[in-house]
Amino acid sequence: MAGLTTAFGGRLILWFLVLWISITAAQKPEHAISSFDNPPARVFFFDDTLSVIYHDRISGNLYVSQDEGKSWKKAEGIPERSVSVVIEHPYDTRLAFALTEGTKHYRTEDRGKTWRPFTIPDSPAVVARPLSFHSDPKKWRYVIYQGTKCEGIVCYDVAYYSKDAFSDEPKLMLTDVNRCQFAHSNKDFKHDAHPDLIFCVASDQRTVTGAHNLASQRLYSSTDFFDKDKKVEDLGIGKNARGVVAFAIVSRFGVVALKDLSRSDGEMQLYVTTDAKNWAKGHFPHASSARLRENAYTIVESTTHSLGVDVVLKDRSTIGTLFLSNSNGTYFVESLKDTNRNEQGFVDYERVYGVDGVGLANVVANAQEVEGRNAPKKLRSMITFDDGRRWQPLRAPPRDDEGNRINCDPSDSEKCALHLHSVTTPHNYGRIFSSPAPGLVMGVGTVGPHLGSYEDSDTFLSTDAGLTWKMVTKEAHQYEFGDQGSILVVVNNEDWTSEIKYSLNLGKTWQTYDFGIKIRSRGLITLPDSTSQKFLLLGLTSRQDQEKDMRLGKVVVIYLDFAKTRKNKCTEKDFDKWYARPTGKRECIMGHKQWYKRRKVDADCYVGEKFIDPEGHEENCECTEEDYEWSVVVYFFVYFTDAPSLSDYNFVRNGDKCEPAGPEPVPPGVCTKNDPTEKYMGSSGFRKIPGNTCVGGKKLDQPVEKYCSKARPAEGSVIHTKFQFDSPIVQFAYFPESTTILVRLLDESIWQSSNEGYTWSQLFKNERFVAFYHHKYSNERAYLITRTKKFYYTTDTGRSWNTMTAPNPPNTFDARVLRFSPSDTDFLIWTGNADCERGKTNCHAEAHFSRKNGRGWTLIDKYVRNCAFAEDKDLSADPSDIICESVKEKKGMQVKGARMELVAGSGYYQGRKRVLFENVVGFAKFSEFLVVAGLQPETKSLELQVSLDGTHFASGKFPPSMSPNTHAYTVLESTTNALFIHMTMTTAPPPAPQWGTLLKSNSNGTYFGVSIENVNRNERGYVDFEKMIGLDGIALVNVVQNVDVLAEGGGVRKGGLGMGSGTTTRQVGELKKLQTRITHNDGSTWRPLTPPVVDSLGNKYECEGTQCALHIHGYTARRDPRATYSSPAAVGVMMAVGNVGTHLAPYGDSDTFISRDGGFTWEEVHKDAHMWEYGDSGSIIIIVNDEEPTDHLMFTTDEGLTWKEYRFSEEKVRVMAVTNVPSDRSRRFLLFGTQEGRKGGSVAIHVDFTELTSRQCLLNEQNPGNDDFELWSPSEDRVELCLFGRQTLYHRRVRDAQCYIGNQPKVEAKIQRNCTCTRVDFECEFNYIKNDKDECVLVPGTTPLPNDDSVCKKGEEYWYERTPYRLIPYSSCEGGTRLDRGTAHRCPGVKSKSGWFWMVMLVLPFGFTALVGYWYYRRSGMARGTIRLPGGDNRAPGSTFGSGSGVLDTLASVPWFLVGMAGIAMDWLSSKLDEGISRSRRGYRNVPIDEDAQILRFEDED
């Protein structure tokens, strides 16, 4: 019995052993190896099928597998070496197309089992996607084919269409196309447009070579395949919708990239639609720097409720800023700064698949060093759990894969965080980090302060969508997810390997499987939905293995089957409910929580739901403020349009409040009692974000009760609202291109209105502010300065304000507190007080630099007076240079008058510092000029230094007796390639009367000649000089007529002409007698103003002789310097206060005048002195009495022909300022003043003219006689209508047209032709001055400039001796009388070039461009405005097999560098052939500057 028991026990043990062995064997995966000659251009699965396609582009062969890649065979029915590209249908999983380079192509309808040929007349175009498909299941067989037609050497792209997947005869649809796409081609782009709507980017003209001018490219649409219906999409901007670079459908947005043809800086514009009908412009914050430029922005992977765009803020940079839009893609906010990208436009950004709100990105931690001194990038990885609102570092795992502690502290995220390689360094096919496996994220990276190299990286896993991480294996591995994440597979990607590692329990434990041969892994893929247990491993085999086994090819595909590793299929008990976002990490996105059913970690089973994507479940949340947005659907597209159907229905955000942009329309039948207390139910201004599913909670979109008095009035009416401030106004300013205005009061409070003064709110009631600054280069940014280190800033036009800490309190040394950079809107310079507390003896000013808008500061220098960025809008200095006026001896108290050096520091003052000048009075930037006032210590005299690049300076040369070393001077504005300087000629100091000579420079700002003498200035250095806005070359001055008498008396009588800031002060003596002069040729000649014949009452003037003229008050008599004669929106119109007589009368004795033709003729419009303001581009002008308190204003809608009165107050108000939005395009005005009877306060009166008329003016450029505009040209007193040597025509509204202009795109001036040169195109040369006969004569005691033959070095055939005249720099006249040319002399050596030289010079640009262009066209597939989208055949940089990552929605602009490359080559070759010409081509002009700075009084006043 015992023996039996023993035997039975032995058999039992043996049985268990066999069972254990069989189980163990069952847990191992299986594999099969297939060989190929070349790596694949593409490998893809037909979605939800077992069929796989392998395309060998090198050999032109196509291979098909019907068993998930286990076995392969060549595609049946396709000839060998013929396939150029293979494209699968994105929706019909049976269809795919194999295109050749010819006209015969192939189609499969059974997932690659069989292929049938079809023919199209033209070969496929070399674009990323030559086929476009329809997303409607009923029309899946609709296909658009883009081909290239060649007629001789002329080639252009054409589009064909088929309604039966090419079983029918393809029909030609459109020629000269760039891209065609069905409007219904993306399932997320849901709209009710016509089912056959097609968009095409196409050209309406081509050159003889077949090329297309970008200006001819437009977006067309059709609903009948362009048979009879062909519509130009005007994008809401009419004729300006030209220059379309690309069109794409991204998520639920249709996007058009448009190049602004009116600019030369390559700026792009983005237009977006969500319904395929209405288009709106995408608006970005900090508009001047977040510009969309060619090859400088990428549309990244986007959600259905937000569009993501990464923008390069600096030219030639690979550092961007990520912006995310509102729900309709029109308004963008900054999400993440310093994003990493590469030259191809790929951005290190990816959303975690299937998990709302979670995304990963890489940022450049040392962006300043990278851009400043080209340092290597230090990348850091960031993650967001709330759709980009907040970003944080990736939490580092505490231990490595062996359980050892990592060598840093994970609680210190600055020094110890996880950083992962991303899109710019792809290491596998498909998505970088995630897959449809719920919540599983993997990556290759390093732990530390920043990302290490790929070779030093390890492999990490997160099972909770990136919240926590663990290291799963050392070294870099490729990875893939299978069976909904229940299988994880990794393979070494750094070295040769013969094994894989896999985990069946979400990375808890790992096993190894050896597949028998050594490979270098190049790809690991599975079914796109990650539901299969089969994987494909692509690799390169070693030569040794190929020699051992002759069946092995250079490339192998290893089929890995994990089906037998587990026997049981999971049941319901094997699953957990996994929530996509953890508690405390903003669980709700778009109004709901999200969860998936996911297999438990230790469940020993397979999911087995093949081809069934993991299903996300939603639980709705209660509504909060984050579920609503402001009703600004079209507001940002119509900034200043006053059309009732647009902006008046909209609301603006003011902090947490939602305020109407203006009076809103009321429902019919309400507000009929004319009772101011009557109320109605109106819009709250909020709406739930489209697609948001929240329920209950806050209901911000419900109607609210409002007073009828706030509703819109009847048409033809004017309305106003009044707001009382408790303190006088000391500062006010609009945000540029906005309806938001800030006001600072004497009590140091700041108030904001987001609707042009209609409503007001106080900002931060408990704070006191000493100033506010608007960002000079970013329209949406402003800064509120307190007396402490704390300051407030906004990046969204005051919709929200945030606090930041400065390095020290604002300075008390009269230096500007903040300076801004034109290159990067986050770059700031702060100048503050240091060691200035009571009792300190070394109080001084310090300047600090921030590259993150105040988040972190770096010391620039101590003991400074003025620090600024060297670069400016038109001054192309080094963007990283900072220039400072720095005290030479830095000790003790900083005092005024201390000796200042001018120091330039490279690398944002952290690199090499160089002293430009050892003793300076000040510096300033004017347009393209950097002007420095230097002090010569030996002679104690001033010297003017001018630079065009911030590096090279030249001394200003002045006529004798007019050197700045003996005179005070004021540098005036420059807009016409020349500097104007006022040189004070009086010797007696103020308050003695002041006047001087106006000098004008040549185009380099170095040689100055006399423009006009005796120009008036006041004791503060301000000059009666003003240029007309919008018409270059027109300027007005006031000259002192009685200088001889004043010079003898040396004084000025009390009283005078001004209003407190004018030319007069306190000393008894002769009063200045001022006369006005105007120039229409940039200061060459000056004339009196022609007086009107009669006054505003129809009476003749008392002064009627030839000595009578119109004289007007200028800059020195102006209370508000912003109240200029002219407006940028009303071309040719000027208003002024003055009188007709022999000289200018006091301000209180003056009347109000208008000119419509640039100052040639004038009319008196009203008696008494008035302030004025332009609105709606000049279609409305209002004037308000400026002599005494008033209760009404006057307005005209016909430029002064008729005037109407509007009463705005019951009590009289002393109006101190009248303002409109900066562009003068709004019909709402704002009056500031003080009210009689109220002491210590002030009042703001909002006057709304939007209901005067509802008809918008019609502009018809094609038929100018049948619209509301006329063509007008400023006229010289001659036959030709020329100004600056050219006849220029402008559109202006017909004077009595009863319509409003609104926000119609401004029509650029038309240059009809250049005129022949006449006397008015010339001015006096250096050392010459005009005599009484208007001739240029040599100043006694001086000599002419020597002759200059340097033009010969520029390739000219002749050089000319100098004359007393020089051509006005801004003139473009041709031929005619050339007063600037004396005797002609032939240049030496011009005819000596060999024939071969000229052949090279002529032929090389064309040959080189053709060569480069052909190579680029055939190889890159990006010679057009292509848009790389998921699933396209897009080569990702660094990808061995040429397959893109498949996740980037990349909208790449057209690269315009072919001509530049040819030019470089030509310059190089020509320099080798003729060094002399090459060297002479570089002149002095090195740089461009500031167009806002107006006056330099030995300090920068901008």
UniProtKB/Swiss-Prot annotation:
Residues that carry a glycan: N328, N1004, N1314
GO cellular component, one term: membrane
Main location: Golgi
Keywords, ordered alphabetically: Glycoprotein, Golgi apparatus, Membrane, Protein transport, Receptor, Repeat, Signal, Transmembrane, Transmembrane helix, Transport
Signal peptide interval: 1-26
Spans within the Cytoplasmic topological domain: 1416-1502
Gene3D superfamilies: 2.10.70.80, 3.30.60.270, YVTN repeat-like/Quinoprotein amine dehydrogenase (2.130.10.10)
Stretches of the chain found on the membrane's Lumenal side: 27-1394
Residues passing through the membrane, by range: 1395-1415
BNR repeats: 63-74, 106-116, 460-470, 502-511, 792-802, 1078-1087, 1153-1163, 1195-1204
BP-aspect Gene Ontology terms: Golgi to endosome transport; Golgi to vacuole transport; protein targeting to vacuole
Membrane topology reported for the UniProt record: Single-pass type I membrane protein
Subcellular location: Golgi apparatus, trans-Golgi network membrane; Prevacuolar compartment membrane
Domain of life: Eukaryota
Record-stated family: Belongs to the VPS10-related sortilin family.
UniProt cross-references to PANTHER family, sorted A to Z: SORTILIN RELATED, SORTILIN-RELATED RECEPTOR
Role this protein plays: Functions as a sorting receptor in the Golgi compartment required for the intracellular sorting and delivery of soluble vacuolar proteins, like carboxypeptidase Y (CPY) and proteinase A. Executes multiple rounds of sorting by cycling between the late Golgi and a prevacuolar endosome-like compartment.
Protein name, as recorded: Vacuolar protein sorting/targeting protein 10
Protein species of origin: Coprinopsis cinerea (strain Okayama-7 / 130 / ATCC MYA-4618 / FGSC 9003)
Lineage: Eukaryota, Fungi, Dikarya, Basidiomycota, Agaricomycotina
The encoding gene: VPS10
